[in-house]
Amino acid sequence: MSKILYRLSKILFLFLMAVVLILILFFQGMPYVCKKEFFLPNIVIATYILLVVGIAFLVCRLWMRSGHMLGKSAISDRVFDRAAACIALCLLAVDIYISYNILFINRWDPGATWEIALFRVNRDWGLPEWTNIYISRYPNNLLLLLLDTACLKLNGAVGVFTGDYAVMSTIILDCITISGACFLVYKVLTLHVKRKYAFGGFLAVVVLCGLSPWMTICYSDSLGILFPVLTYYLYTKPAGNTRRKWASQIFAVIICCIGYFIKPQCAIMLIAIVMTEFFNFCKERKLYQMARPFLLVALACVCLSVTSSVVTKQYESIGVELNPETKFGMTHFLMMGLNEADGGMYSQEDVDYSISFETSKERTAANIEKSIQRLRDMGFLGYMRHLSRKLLTTYHDGTFAWGMEGSFYTRVMDDVNTWMAPFLKSIFYSDGSRHEILKTIEQIVWVGVLLFAFAAGFVRQTEENQADLNILTLSIVGLTLFQMLFEVRARYLFLYVPVYCILATLGFENLWTGIQRKSGVKRKEKEKKHENAKTESNFVDRYPLL
């Protein structure tokens, strides 16, 4: 039973990744929302990547056939570890400097949460009337508001940033989580592959996340990037004894539940862990294996309940009254995800429709009814076409739709210096003269990550790595299905980019070592045949009459 479940999980991952690759390589001409044009088509990028890797494999094989062996890396593990730590620290400083130079204010959700946080800190201003409505409608932003408020209070006490630049206090937190997530990718990979491969995966996530313009917007998409990879690391890392292992895994569940209140998609990693534990129970059928999934779910429920209660009381203490009847539930986002006219993205028409119902029960029933009606109107083929467009919106863009949605550059700050600020703005602003260079580099790395992440589905599973690998692949399956079902955004993928980079590194390492192993076996067989022939020749020369 366990083998069947693991195999089905692997097949589902390979199927979804194959569909994604086919769409972004061969159907990028389809119309879909937030479509961004790149200097090179994805199929050209993929061809170049495979060509370079193929040439490298060929050179390696020829080198080994000529009697040489690929020696071990001259760089020690300690050097790789120190280099990764230093780069992560430097990345934090660079991100803060870049953010300070290209700072701007936007008017969509990050701007709204920031404005409410300002009113909370400056209580003499009085909270605006729309605060209760916004927080009640989108309660998932409650913890984010608390973090923004805490950063503002700390900045007010220290006095580092003033005026409009006070928002830098929250952006610094954003930069910390991004650089921390990048370093965790390296730490996770060192548990599975050699340091040289781990360092390569680390550099990939630095390009895609560490140097992404999303670092300048302190919102749940970038702030939540730390939680899935940290949850995975804490849950799977080796421990000295059973007690430490349990403590680490309990802490992983707590971290994931906190991440849920930053970005609900963080919970997908915990769901993948629980499902994998159930797979293990089906394999061993032991009592403690059966108890683990239920204990994890129970612990998660307690953590979610406690965190929700604490956060809610924080707001009630300042006079904010949360109205559960105005909350937008999952059925609202399911309805938006089925809106073919808006490509499954945000729809003001759907928001107005949900607002028109006074109670949560009425709203849920109406959302479900409209969702069913939209499915009937699209039909099977229409729904498949709709899902294809949603997957293109999700996966096609290596910048994750930077500058493509909402009111982005509502207010741009004046240049803080004469040269560096204009130069950085020309790179990171979507309308900058040098932005094409950045987005092309990120697109090349992203296409490569998707290609090798697909190859991770062919990694040979052993007793040691089967469960760990299954958690990674199941989390990607869950995230992809989430995007297909509910409201779609390319930036929703951003917080799982570290997981994609981990899978891509595992896939590349599997391909590379496979070629080495195959070439090495053939070379040894050839040497053995040559040695046997030489022995027979010497025997005949020594005993000619025989």
In which residue ranges do the predicted regions lie?
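Extracytosolic helix-loop segments that constitute the early lumenal/periplasmic catalytic or substrate-binding loops
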Residues: 111-137, 143, 342-348
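Start-transfer (signal-anchor) and selected internal transmembrane alpha helices
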Residues: 1-96, 291-300, 518-519, 525, ...
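Transmembrane-helix motifs of polytopic, lipid-linked glycan transferases
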Residues: 169-192, 230, 451-458
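Transmembrane-helix signature of polytopic, membrane-embedded enzymes
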Residues: 185-207, 466-470
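Membrane-interface anchor segments at the N-terminal boundary of transmembrane helices
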Residues: 21, 36-49, 167-169, 173-174, ...
